[in-house]
């Protein structure tokens, strides 16, 4: 009886090990396929003109996505201005002034907002800014991306602040330091790497959004000049070129998708760099 039971346990162990390995491969496979196709279709189309020139009129060959690349960074900068202060301060409130029903409601609302489809955000900001201003604009695009960042930044900030040992707070208060100074000078400084990590993850999430920008930024064939004018962005340009009838536009859409993927990849590498010490074994 002992030998069959031992063999059965070995079989179950081998089966589960193989199953989990297969699932791990399935997780990695889509990423490999995405990289393969983007490199195959898009890398050959990347040159200096792609980064420095404006799009050519439809039907003409050449040009680039310089305006869309600049526009993407403009929108991300605005999104950070809108989303980071509100998200971080909201996370501080939830972490340091917690324990109330209001906090529970705020956490619940933030979790719900994290799952709201991005097109809904675009429709809301379209009604709040685009309609009253009578124009699509870079301002509206930055606001919608910033609003999408807020719940994610808030929740990640709350979580990293809660990892700060309570003894730090107690020691500061025992020395007569006020609570707000304790939070700003000790708690936030201690958790700064985690807060920056949350901000970068939120930026990586909104960097590739297209649907909300269709309702707010719209797109533009020229370089960005004013925040009150429509602005180009890489996700918008990729979408418009992908559905276009011209092969050269399709080629540039692949190149734009490859560059956008690299942008998100670099942001995630930055996150890994900031958090590398957190996972090292302590001696």
List PLM regions with ranges.
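Generic hydrophobic transmembrane alpha-helix motif, especially the helices
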Residues: 111-147
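Transmembrane alpha-helices
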Residues: 157, 179-216
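Hydrophobic alpha-helical transmembrane segments of multipass integral membrane proteins
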Residues: 70, 74-82, 86, 90, ...
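Periplasmic/extracellular loop-to-transmembrane helix junction in inner-membrane transport proteins
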Residues: 3-19, 36-79, 99, 237-251
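Interhelical loop and adjacent transmembrane-helix boundary motif
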Residues: 58-59, 213-261
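Transmembrane-helix boundary motif in ABC transporter permease subunits
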Residues: 78-110, 123, 272-277
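C-terminal transmembrane helix and the adjacent membrane-cytosol boundary/short C-terminal tail
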Residues: 15-18, 158-162, 200, 240-283
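Glycine/proline-centered hinge or cleavage motifs at structural transition points of membrane proteins
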Residues: 117, 175-176, 189
């Amino acid at each position: 009886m002992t030998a069959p039971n031992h063999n059965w346990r070995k079989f179950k162990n081998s089966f589960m090990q193989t199953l989990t390995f297969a699932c791990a491969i399935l997780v990695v496979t889509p990423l490999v396929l995405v990289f393969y196709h983007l490199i195959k279709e898009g890398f050959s189309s990347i040159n200096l003109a792609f980064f420095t020139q404006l799009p050519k009129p439809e039907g003409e060959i050449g040009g680039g996505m310089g305006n869309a690349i600049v526009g993407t960074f403009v929108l991300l900068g605005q999104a950070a201005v809108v989303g980071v202060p509100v998200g971080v301060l909201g996370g501080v409130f939830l972490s340091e002034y917690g324990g109330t029903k209001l906090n529970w409601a705020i956490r619940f609302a933030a979790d719900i907002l994290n799952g709201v489809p991005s097109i809904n955000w675009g429709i809301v900001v379209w009604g709040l800014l685009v309609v009253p201003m009578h124009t699509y604009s870079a301002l509206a695009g930055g606001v919608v991306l910033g609003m999408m960042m807020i719940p994610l930044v808030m929740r990640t900030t709350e979580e990293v602040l809660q990892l700060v040992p309570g003894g730090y707070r107690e020691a500061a208060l025992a020395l007569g330091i006020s609570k707000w100074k304790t939070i700003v000078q000790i708690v936030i400084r201690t958790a700064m790497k985690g807060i920056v990590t949350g901000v970068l993850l939120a930026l990586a999430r909104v960097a590739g959004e297209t649907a909300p920008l269709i309702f707010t930024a719209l797109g533009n064939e020229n370089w960005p000049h004013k925040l009150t004018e429509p602005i180009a962005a890489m996700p918008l340009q990729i979408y418009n070129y992908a559905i276009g009838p011209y092969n050269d536009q399709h080629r540039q859409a692949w190149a734009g998708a490859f560059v956008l993927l690299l942008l998100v990849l670099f942001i995630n590498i930055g996150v890994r760099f900031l958090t590398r010490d957190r996972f090292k074994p302590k001696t």
